[in-house]
A protein has these predicted regions:
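N-terminal hydrophobic targeting/anchoring segments and the immediately downstream early-domain regions
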Residues: 2-209, 213-225, 281-291, 295-302, ...
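A generic structural motif
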Residues: 273, 336-337
Length: 337
């Protein structure tokens, strides 16, 4: 019995040690920064940037890695201090609950081993989160709420139009105040339950992508196996999202789901991070026809800043993507993604 107790003690010590070192290592491998700071910026560009009244970004997975977002980090790009340094007023923090092994842009199986499970365990999260997508969602929601609470009025959890208007008003005189919204990448997080949709709404979620990198109960992913449209359950979810006031994010949806959503939604959509086929002809990116339908819906398109969406070299292609959307429908439909 004594040896068993010692063995359990050693294992416990090893586990808690792993929670300190493994998540940062995984983030360093999976979420690398291509160009390290300091960055060279022309004085003219800096002047233009400083004149911008309100900067927002529609996509950030920083909650996934277990970092304290109230502290300036050394990994990734985003936390509250670096938002302030960059004059970013509003960030959409998105929750990732499942990632298939061998994740790629072309075809992924929903039955593949889930990469997020070992990360969840390594982060030292509650065993209730280890194998539950909805619990992972609520845990990350609570994390964001906690970070905002720690800011003692210097951060606003944006859950409504009134919250956004308050943020804009406050930032007109105090740029140190920042805002955060909450989204979900892939409605598989709902685990097939409409009741869970109401649950995540109460937790502060205001944007959900029907699919992420694989097909689910709502329909087909742009990177899945069947490229199908909305299922009956998918249509129920879209209807309920409209009723609640949750933005529909089409960033990873199959073309069929994009068409189905635009045909039935009663509210403007978002495409949080994406490119266009005219610049990079990938199955994920938007055609001119889709761009026009999104604009007609009153939606916005977040241009992604990475090679899988815009191709390489990235910066010229980001500019080309922005210009293309501008030329097709107008600058007012473009956002940062």
């Amino acid at each position: 019995m004594k040896k068993l107790i010692i063995a359990l003690g050693v294992l416990t010590l090893l586990y808690f040690t792993a929670t300190l070192f493994v998540p940062p290592y995984i983030e360093g491998q999976r979420n690398p920064v291509k160009l390290a700071s300091p960055y060279t910026i022309s004085s003219e560009a800096q002047k233009i940037y400083n004149r911008l009244d309100f900067i927002s970004d529609l996509h950030c997975d920083a909650l996934l890695w277990g970092r304290d977002l109230t502290e300036r980090g050394t990994r990734g790009h985003v936390d509250f201090p670096r938002m302030r340094e960059a004059n970013v007023g509003l960030e959409m923090f998105t929750i990732v609950t499942k990632s298939p092994a061998g994740q790629n842009m072309k075809s992924n199986s929903a039955d593949s081993f889930d990469n997020i499970t070992p990360l969840t365990i390594a982060k030292g999260e509650s065993p209730a989160n280890w194998f539950s997508l909805i619990n992972r969602t609520l845990s990350q929601s609570n994390d964001l709420a906690g970070f905002i609470s720690e800011e003692e009025g210097k951060a606003i959890f944006v859950k409504s139009k009134a919250d956004l208007e308050q943020l804009i008003q406050v930032r007109s005189t105090d740029k140190s105040v920042i805002g955060a919204m909450l989204g979900i990448e892939g409605a598989h997080a709902l685990e097939g339950s409409l009741e869970n949709l109401d649950l995540v709404y109460e937790a502060g979620v205001r944007m959900i992508g029907p699919t992420h990198f694989f097909d689910n109960k709502l329909g087909g992913s742009a990177h899945g196996e069947n490229l199908g449209g909305l299922t009956d359950f998918g249509r129920q979810v879209i209807t309920r999202m409209n009723e609640l006031g949750i933005f529909i994010d089409l960033a990873h949806c199959s073309p069929a789901i994009v068409d189905d959503v635009l045909s039935m939604t009663t509210e403007p959509v978002m495409v949080s991070h994406i490119g266009v086929k005219a610049v990079l002809n990938s199955q994920r990116n938007l055609s001119d026809k889709q761009i026009k339908r999104i604009a007609a819906n009153g939606g916005i398109i977040g241009v992604a800043f990475f090679d899988m969406a815009v191709g390489e070299p990235e910066l010229p292609n980001i500019i080309a993507t922005i210009r293309h959307i501008r030329d097709v429908v107008g600058i007012e439909y473009i956002a940062l993604g």
